[in-house]
């Protein structure tokens, strides 16, 4: 098994409810190490740039508005098969379809306010990590 890194974002709906610690505990219980973490408030330009792949989708404007509505916690998670493991811990994008005891099933408010973002591939993880972190900010 390969040690990988993936990006996680704890979204404004979760930071507003002080769920950062509870969500971090889920990652750590699953064997993922938090090797980079910062709390910030995304600018409109940052959110638009990060979600640029969705620019032509109907939900793009509301997604950017939501992601800039409050603080987020951006994180680099590391572990064996980190991308897949993180996606399993998060649960399905739509919390109504998420498995029991996943972050989204337990904490999400809606399909948009679903508490967390996670990279969907190792390639995207590398790109997303570089978007928010310099190599010197990641300490394994």
Curated annotation (Swiss-Prot):
One of its GO terms (cellular component) is cytoplasm. Gene3D superfamilies: Nucleoside diphosphate kinase-like domain (3.30.70.141). It is an enzyme of class 2 (transferase). This is Nucleoside diphosphate kinase. The keyword Signal does not apply. One of its GO terms (biological process) is UTP biosynthetic process. Homotetramer. It comes from the Bacteria. It catalyses: a 2'-deoxyribonucleoside 5'-diphosphate + ATP = a 2'-deoxyribonucleoside 5'-triphosphate + ADP; a ribonucleoside 5'-diphosphate + ATP = a ribonucleoside 5'-triphosphate + ADP. NCBIfam families: PRK00668.1 (NF001908). GO terms for molecular function: ATP binding; metal ion binding; nucleoside diphosphate kinase activity. Its cofactor is Mg(2+). PROSITE patterns: NDPK_LIKE (PS51374). Belongs to the NDK family. Keywords: ATP-binding, Cytoplasm, Kinase, Magnesium, Metal-binding, Nucleotide metabolism, Nucleotide-binding, Phosphoprotein, Transferase. Major role in the synthesis of nucleoside triphosphates other than ATP. The ATP gamma phosphate is transferred to the NDP beta phosphate via a ping-pong mechanism, using a phosphorylated active-site intermediate. The active site is at residue 117. Its EC number is 2.7.4.6. It is found in: Cytoplasm. ATP binds at residues 11, 59, 87, 93, 104, 114.
